[in-house]
A protein has these predicted regions:
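Ordered core of a single globular domain
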Residues: 196-262
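Sequence/fold signature of self-assembling virion shell proteins
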Residues: 236-368
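A structural signal for short, well-ordered beta-strand segments and their strand-loop junctions
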Residues: 49-51, 218-222, 265-268
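N-terminal alpha-helical "arm" segments
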Residues: 1-49, 354-368
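Long, contiguous amphipathic alpha-helices that act as assembly "spine/axial" helices in icosahedral shell
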Residues: 87-178, 198-224, 341-349
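Intrinsically disordered, low-complexity coil segments
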Residues: 23-29, 111-118, 161-169, 193-194, ...
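Surface-exposed cleft-lining segments at the edges of enzyme active sites
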Residues: 185-195
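Assembly/oligomerization interface modules of large self-assembling protein complexes
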Residues: 38-113
Length: 368
């Protein structure tokens, strides 16, 4: 067996990581809950090189601000301009060092005389899998941000300190949603207007405006927008009639009405991620809850991606596995490298979600 399949402390058990990934793929099982971009985007064929000049030339987008440069081990600090950014690719990378407590726990398991080999193996795999899911989930969360934010924010995502606190070029990725695809509600959807706002009229106006251009399959929105519609007086009257307007309206009632009348159904988007800011993990919701997004059926784009450096040239002493186009590396650092003994788990993806169907996507701004 080639040496690169093994890490310093888990040894051949690292093969279980790829085995789990493969088994889940074969069964079409979702290993990571609440990942949204994979439902709406397909991974493009990986390339050796991927830069913004190619993306800008092929798609109607303006791109700035990668997470880190393709030649960088650490985050790029500063505020370089758009022209320098065009020469870089997005590298979303997270490395998790094993705590000394967990490291000692592994050594205790390995040294235990009372534990049978099977129990040792199960405990080691559990520890190893925990680190793997943490780093892979972090990369998936960043890709969800880069998809959900522009989808719900008129095609624009700002790479600022809120979502990219580790540094990097500041700026925007703009998928240039057509101005005619964006409309505002006639009355702001606020609590003060619950008795007068006509939510369905706003929805109907969007559907009518797009009828010669696209057919919508769903209306994506934050749970708060669905709750607002269900509480509004005119929606209650529309669903139950004037004489029963005091009756509670739920999402299932609203969607039953939409289906009966051949309208797109509402789908709540629930996604919160945690952004590491120094020692703090700050919750962040990428979806702009003020906007409702009307989308056609089918995929909305692709995830452009490139081979990771260690896919092109593997290192000895490192165990590798792949979750789709996310590359996972596991390795140990010992005394010869100036360490008391630490195990690292890293996930990375050189990629960018690209919304290609923006011409068929419409936005209803419910508040300013």
């Amino acid at each position: 067996m080639p040496e690169f399949l093994y890490s310093s402390i888990f040894g051949a058990l690292t093969q279980h990581v790829q085995a789990r990934f493969d088994a889940a793929s074969k069964l079409h099982k979702q290993l990571f809950d609440n990942v949204i971009f994979e439902r709406f985007l397909d991974w493009d064929t990986p390339t050796i090189g991927l830069d913004f000049e190619e993306i800008i030339g092929q798609y109607n987008i303006t791109v700035a601000a990668p997470t880190i440069g393709d030649n960088s081990k650490e985050a790029i600090l500063g505020t370089e301009g758009l022209e320098t950014v065009k020469e870089r690719i997005l590298n979303h990378a997270v490395t998790l060092p094993m705590t000394i407590q967990d490291y000692r726990k592994v050594l205790q398991i390995l040294d235990s005389k009372s534990l049978p080999d099977k129990a040792k193996t199960e405990q080691l795999i559990k520890l190893m899998w925990g680190s793997t899911t943490t780093v892979v989930s972090s990369v998936l969360a960043k890709l969800d941000i880069l998809f959900l934010r522009p989808l719900s924010n008129e095609g624009i995502v700002e790479l600022d300190d809120n979502i990219n606190p580790e540094g990097g070029v500041r700026g925007t990725i703009n998928f240039n949603q057509p101005a005619e695809n964006i409309a505002s509600s006639k009355t702001p959807w606020t609590d003060a207007n619950l008795e007068t706002v006509d939510c369905f009229e706003d929805v109907q106006d969007i559907i009518d405006a797009a009828q010669d251009k696209t057919v919508f399959g769903k209306i994506l929105c934050a749970p708060s927008r669905i709750s607002y519609m269900c509480r509004s007086k005119k929606i209650k009257q529309m669903i139950w009639g004037t004489d029963k307007s005091a009756k509670i309206v739920q999402l299932k009632d609203l969607n039953a009405y939409m289906q009966e009348n051949s309208y797109p159904v509402f789908e709540p988007i629930r996604r919160q991620v945690r952004i590491q800011k120094g020692k703090l993990r700050v919750p962040y919701t990428p979806w702009n809850e003020k906007n409702m997004v009307f989308i056609p059926d089918g995929k909305l784009g692709i995830v452009k991606n490139a081979w990771a450096n260690n896919e092109l040239k593997q290192e000895t002493g490192v165990a590798y596995s792949n979750y789709g186009r996310i590359r996972v590396s596991q390795w140990g650092v010992g005394e010869t490298q100036g360490s008391n003994g630490v195990e690292f788990t890293k996930a990375e993806s050189l990629s960018l979600p690209v919304i290609t169907e923006m011409n068929g996507i419409y936005t209803l701004k419910t508040q300013q």
